[in-house]
Amino acid sequence: MQDKIDAATNRTAPSGLRPIDLLAVVGLVGCCMSWGLNQVAMKVANDGITPLFQASARNVMAALLIWGWAWWRGIALFASDGSFWPGMASGLLFALNFMFIGPGLVLTEASRGVLFLYTAPFFVALGAHFLLPGDRLSLLKVIGLLAAFAGLMLSLSDRLGAGGTPASLRGDLYCLAAGFFWAATTLVIRATTLRWISPEKNLFYELVVSAPILLAAAWFYDEQGIVHLGPVVVWSFLYTTVVVVFISYAVWVWLLNTYPASQVSVFTFLGPIFAVIAGHLLLGEPVTWRLGAALLLVALGIYLVNRPRSRVRH
C-alpha cells in the first residue's frame, strides 16, 4: 500500500486540518490492521486460486470498484494530463511486485514475507535521496535504515541455520524483491507527473495495466488458475479485493484529507506487527526470538523513516 499512501499524501493538503483524535487513531489502526492481514489472506487464497491468476483477478475487480468510486465522486480517470507513460511504468512495476509477492508467499510464511515486503519504505528513502531534490537522508532516516537492515539480517539468519530450506529462503528473497518493486512504483509516482494527479487515477493505472500482465504471466508459468473455491478461499480473496484495496484505501484518503499527512504516515509501522500476529494466530506460524527481534527493528525503522521532521521555532 505504500504507493497508494504516497500518491494520496502527495496531494495538496486542505487548510484547517484537525489534530489526531480518537476517530483518527481508530481509522489508522484499522487501516494498518487490514494491510497486516492482507498477506495472510493472500496466502490462504493461494490454496484455491494460484498466485498470479489471483492477483490478476483481484486487480480487475478492484479496478471496477475504483472506477465506480471515481464516477460517484466525479473524479476524472480518463482526462489527458500527460500521465499516460508514467502510468504505464507504474503499472508495470506494480505487476512485478505481485509477480514476486504471490509466489513468495507460497514458499515462505506470511509473517516472514510481510517483513521483507515492508522493506519498501527503506528502498524509497534510499532512492529518494538520489532521485528527488529536497528529500535527503537525515540522521534519523539513516538510523532507521540501519535498524531495518539489522532486522533483515537477523531474520535471514533463521533461514541460513538449521530451520531453513532453499525453497523457504527463495520465498524470503522473492518477498524482498517485491518490496523493491513496491518502492520503485512509489518513486515513479513521486518523480513524474503522477505526483499531480488524483490518487484514484494513480491506483487505476496500476490495477488496469498490471491485470493483463499478471494474467499473461499466469499463462506463461502454466498456472491452473482456480483450483477450488471453498468458503475460506472465497472470503480471503474478497477480503484482499474489497477491504484492502478499496475500503481501506478510501478510509486512508479521507484520513489524509482530514488530518496532517506527516502524522498519519507514521502509523504505517503497525502493518508488519499486525501481519506477524495474524500469521501466528490464524495460520499457526512460529514466532522465533529472531523473528520477533527483527520485527521490532523493522517497525522501528519504518517509524524513524516516516517520522515528521521537527521544525525550528523562532
Residue ranges and their predicted role:
Residues 55-57, 113-119, 188-211, 241-281:
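Helix-helix packing/entry segments at the starts of transmembrane helices
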Residues 66, 88, 94, 119, ...:
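Hydrophobic transmembrane alpha-helices of multi-pass small-molecule transport proteins
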Residues 34, 38-41, 67-117, 153-154, ...:
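Specific transmembrane alpha-helical segments of multi-pass solute transporters/efflux pumps
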